[in-house]
Every structure is written in C-alpha cells, then in structure tokens.
C-alpha cells in the first residue's frame, strides 16, 4: 500500500528521499519506466551492515539515478550510537548503548550542498528517531521544498527517544503540513475521508483528528503550498 500511494508523487520527476532505506525495498520498488529519466533517489541508511547490500542491489538498476548515503539522519552534527539487531537489520535504533558510532547528517545541509530545489516525497522510517530527522530538515520543509512526507508513527519507538506522536503532529503543523492516515485498514482513521489530487491521481486519505495513536501506523503529510492553495 505504501508503494501504491508513493508512485503518483514521482510522475513529475524530482528528488525522492528514502530516510531509513533498510534494504531499499521502497526505493527499488519505485524504480519504474515512469521514474527512470526524471527522478533521483537518495537512500539514507545508518546501519553499516546494510550499505553493501544496497550497493549490490543498485547494480541491477544502473539506468536509474540512485545515491546511497551512509549516515544517521539527525537534527544536529556529531555522531550517534546505533543499536543493531542481527536478527532484524531494519530494527536498528539510536541509543546510548549502541555498539557502533555513526556520523550524523542533517538533511537541510545535504539538500543545500546538493542544490536540491524540489522534493515531491520523503519517506521516514527510522525506529522512533523521526522527529530528529524532521528537525534537521525544518528549513526545507518550511519553504515548501518537501511537498509531502510519509512517516512511521510507532509510539513505543518514539517513547524510547522521549517523544510522543503529538510532537510529530505539532512539528508538521508548525511547518505548514496537514496530516492524514492512508492505510485502508488503519484503526486510527476517521470515517470521513478526504480527496487529495497528486499529479492527476486522486488519493483517498483520512484526516488525523487527534494525537492518540493505537498501535503502529503510517501517516502522510502534505505541504499546504503544494496541495491546498
């Protein structure tokens, strides 16, 4: 379902940020004939064990513009310690007890250094560290360069970092975004749906009406300047 909702955003080209790329399933799944010529994929991954896997898989997509970046997407420069789980590489998280130090990367700096003007979509799934990533991209978000964001909301993982779902929603509202649930089976969604047109495709989404989240879910946030003016 995530791939289906992400595809329309890239039909007009631009840069896709995959923050917490893991093995690259989302990015490689979006490598289609429609995105081959006009899209650049930026795959950010903190776990050093996954970087060789991403490079190996990328060899099968040589006609696509894929950029694999090793680093911990954070709100400030420095280093973070990463707690790795051998049995589940995608569940690595930032914590003081981490066994490996990873250099931090602030997305505002990366976006400026690479002269990126338009990001139709960013996906963020970094095991509770999402708010740090958002804070490190605040300037780009406030300016509307990031037109939409899909991110995981997992209360236990957020709590591990001292954050709540409400903190995420407040940040997104402050930077000019409206948040929606999009999974058809999401128990958090309201009965009232909304229609948002993305480059000719109509998405049926459900407004986030409160910050109490049941279980683990994903939300999509649209910048008002791109979709509501």
Kindly give the residue locations of the regions a language model identified.
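Phosphate/nucleotide-binding beta-alpha loop and adjacent structural elements of enzyme active sites
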Residues: 1-229
């Amino acid at each position: 379902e995530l791939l289906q909702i992400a595809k329309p955003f890239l039909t007009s080209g631009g840069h896709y940020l995959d923050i917490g790329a893991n093995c690259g399933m989302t990015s490689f799944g979006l490598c289609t004939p429609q995105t081959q010529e006009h899209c650049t994929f930026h795959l950010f991954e903190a776990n050093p064990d996954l970087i060789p896997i991403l490079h190996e898989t990328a060899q099968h997509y040589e006609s696509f513009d894929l950029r694999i970046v090793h680093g911990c997407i954070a709100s400030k420069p420095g280093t973070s310690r990463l707690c790795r789980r051998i049995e589940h590489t995608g569940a690595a998280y930032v914590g003081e007890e981490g066994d490996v130090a990873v250099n931090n990367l602030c997305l505002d700096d990366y976006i400026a250094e690479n002269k990126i003007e338009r990001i139709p979509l960013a996906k963020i799934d970094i095991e509770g560290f999402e708010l740090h990533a958002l804070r490190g991209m605040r300037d780009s978000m406030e300016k509307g360069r990031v037109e939409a964001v899909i991110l995981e909301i997992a209360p236990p993982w957020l709590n591990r970092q001292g954050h709540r779902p409400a903190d995420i929603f407040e940040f997104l509202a402050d930077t000019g975004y409206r948040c929606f649930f999009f999974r058809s089976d999401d128990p958090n969604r309201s009965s009232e749906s909304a229609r948002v047109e993305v480059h000719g495709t109509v998405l049926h989404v459900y407004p986030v009406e409160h910050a109490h989240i049941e279980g683990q879910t994903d939300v999509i946030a649209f910048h008002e300047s791109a979709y509501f003016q």
